[in-house]
A protein has these predicted regions:
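Short alpha-helical donor nucleotide-sugar binding micro-motif in glycosyltransferases
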Residues: 9-14, 104
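Aromatic "clamp/platform" in nucleotide-sugar-dependent glycosyltransferases that forms part
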Residues: 20-22
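Short hydrophobic beta-strand element within catalytic cores of glycosyltransferases
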Residues: 39-42
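A short, well-ordered alpha-helix in the C-terminal region of glycosyltransferases
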Residues: 81-94, 103-106
Length: 134
């Protein structure tokens, strides 16, 4: 089990992060790889492509020929540093812990109804409500 700086070092040194899963929720490892600036190739399932439609590439799940073509394509294309920096910023802006926590709270408040709405109006130390600018 690797965390912290050693994990960042691994992601920053990978030429291409490949996630071939066909049944998975939003992958923490995918978010980690993207947040470090790694190029990512994922199976074309909504849980992956919700994150990689802009920064990343996908292949058809369980289609080894499509995976092979995607691997060849991604390994031969350049990935400009400017794009990598945009990717890092996008992930930090949209998927940081505090942002995701605010989004989960919004869903819970929406499901439960009015009693919890007052809680969303209180300023939470260190957090900006989803969609708001810091």
């Amino acid at each position: 089990y690797v965390v912290g700086d050693p994990l960042k070092e691994l992601y920053s040194n990978c030429g291409l992060f490949v996630l071939p899963s066909h049944t998975e929720g939003l992958s923490l490892s995918l978010l980690e790889a993207l947040s470090i600036g790694a190029r990512c190739l994922v199976s074309d399932i909504p849980e992956n492509t919700v994150v990689t439609d802009i920064y990343g590439a996908a292949f058809k799940p369980e289609d080894t020929d499509d995976l092979a073509r995607a691997l060849e394509r991604e390994c031969t294309q350049e990935y400009p540093d400017a794009m990598r920096q945009q990717q890092i910023q996008y992930i930090h802006t949209n998927f940081e812990y505090d942002v995701m926590l605010d989004r989960y709270e919004e869903v819970y408040h929406h499901v439960v109804g009015d009693p919890l709405k007052a809680m969303t109006k209180k300023k939470k130390k260190g957090r900006v409500p989803a969609g708001a600018k810091a």
